[in-house]
Curated annotation (Swiss-Prot):
Record protein name field: NADH-quinone oxidoreductase subunit I
List of residues binding [4Fe-4S] cluster 1: 63, 66, 69, 112
Cofactor-binding details, from the entry: Binds 2 [4Fe-4S] clusters per subunit.
Stretches that traverse the bilayer: none
Subunit structure: NDH-1 is composed of 14 different subunits. Subunits NuoA, H, J, K, L, M, N constitute the membrane sector of the complex.
Similarity annotation: Belongs to the complex I 23 kDa subunit family.
A Pfam family matched in the record: Fer4_7
Annotated residues for binding of [4Fe-4S] cluster 2: 73, 102, 105, 108
Any GO BP annotation: aerobic respiration
Primary localization: membrane
Domain 4Fe-4S ferredoxin-type intervals: 53-83, 93-122
Organism: Bordetella pertussis (strain Tohama I / ATCC BAA-589 / NCTC 13251)
Keyword match Glycosyltransferase: no
Topology within the bilayer: Peripheral membrane protein
Length: 162
């Protein structure tokens, strides 16, 4: 009896029509997929993307070379070298982040006592070779200078929750 039922089921293509009915059901509904390059998904104020080094309003870089971000980084993606200034303060001579190692956990941003290193909202970056994802101090400062207004706005939005 079961064999006869299977024979007529395959002869009448019932599985095919069940699938077509399901396809037809969703074919005319509103699409939920975003067309990515033209339509962007909104990100939260706490989104962790590309890193940036910030400056004070007078143009001096904020990093005081305390190396807390280097120590707290679980992926060992941050490398810092510093030197002593004439006035006794330390400043960085080298600040590198290897984005191929970085896991974007945000520990570096949380540990920074002067809000020097931040993770921006930028997630659309790429590299054609491995060295393109190795950010130096000058590159990080350039990102910070370019997006300072956006960084400050997002940090102000997030301030009540910190």
């Amino acid at each position: 009896m079961e064999a006869i039922k299977d024979f007529f089921g395959s002869l009448l293509l019932t599985e095919l029509f069940k699938g077509l009915r399901l396809t037809g059901k969703y074919f005319f509904k509103r699409k939920v997929t975003l067309r990515y390059p033209m339509e962007k998904t909104p990100t939260s104020a706490r989104f962790r993307g590309l890193h940036a080094l910030r400056r004070y309003p007078n143009g001096e870089e904020r990093c005081i070379a305390c190396k807390l971000c280097e120590a707290v980084c679980p992926a060992l993606a941050i490398t810092i070298e510093s030197e002593q200034r004439d006035d006794g303060t330390r400043r960085t001579t080298r600040y590198d982040i290897d984005l191929t190692k970085c896991i974007f956990c945000g520990f570096c941003e949380e540990s920074c006592p002067v809000d020097s290193i931040v993770e921006t909202h930028i997630h659309e970056y790429h590299g054609e070779k491995r060295g393109d994802l190795y950010f130096t101090k000058d590159m990080l400062l350039a990102v910070g200078d370019r997006y300072e207004a956006e960084i400050a706005r997002r940090r102000a939005e997030d301030a009540p929750y910190r």
